[in-house]
Structure formats: structure tokens, C-alpha cells
């Protein structure tokens, strides 16, 4: 089947009214259109990005975010959905705009990211003058949802209350990370 026909059918699937979640035993999993496992091999590399909101959102498996400088006004710079992502050598800077009321603020968010690797990145929070108290809303460097066997190594977290936040379903191996809370 030609690629444009496959893409057209996929777009139609995404726009049809379907339940977004289904019950499977005791846990909830995303239904067919929310399957992040097909390999997409997207790569964002050697970029300088400044954004008012999220700079990168990728869905699919085997994606790479490497050697970028990403600066955003909000609280989340990158959101990745899907397994086996590689995030390495980046500098993430967030300015913590208090108008951004996203729940569980984190510079890097991963969902269903089994087997992902996050290494040798720098996570920096620069608070807006409007931001009143450091304790108002704990900012995480990395937030994991439903993500198992994630390796987090060699990262530096600056002015971040919680370097890694994860739900009960997520598991990590963490080593060589540094927290600078000046």
C-alpha cells in the first residue's frame, strides 16, 4: 500500500471517536490509537530551540533527542511518548512561568517509555520574577509515567526540587547524577 494511503488511513483512525483507554485487568492501558510502540526513529539533534511552551513532543519508539539546547518559558521542555527513547547531551532551561499550571511540572516528561536512556544532560530552572516561592510547586527534572527499566545517568540538575519523579509503575537505574541547589 502506498505511504500516502497508509498515512491517510492512520489520520482517519486518529480522528474517529473511540475510547482513549480500555481496562486490562487491574491497570489501564491506552487503546489502539494510543499505541506508542511502533518504531518512528524521529531524531532532534544539534538544535537550538526557544519556545513559549513545550519545544519537542514525540510519540513512537526508538526516538532520539541529542545535543540540543532547549529553552522554554513554561515548566516542560520535552514530552516523549513511547519506549526506547535516547535523550543525551542536551541542555534544558525552563523559566517557570507561573501561569503554566500543568500538573506534575517537569523539564522532561516520558510516558510508556520502557527501556529509555537519559544521560549526560543538564537540567536548569531559572525562576521568573513572578514566581513567589520555591516550594509552591515542586519542579522535577524528569517525570516518568508507566515507564519501566529507564536508565538515568550522568545528568546535572540545577535549582530543581525533585531530580526524578516517577509513578509507582515506573522503575529506574540511576547513577552518576548531580544536584546543584545553589
Question: What is the predicted function of each stretch?
Answer:
Residues 48, 53, 61-62, 69, ...:
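Position-specific detector for the leucine-rich repeat
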Residues 71-72, 76, 84-86, 93, ...:
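Short, surface-exposed, polar/charged, turn-prone segments marking secondary-structure boundaries
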Residues 138-139, 150-182:
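Predominantly polar beta-repeat domains that present long G/T/S/D/N-rich surfaces used to bind, process
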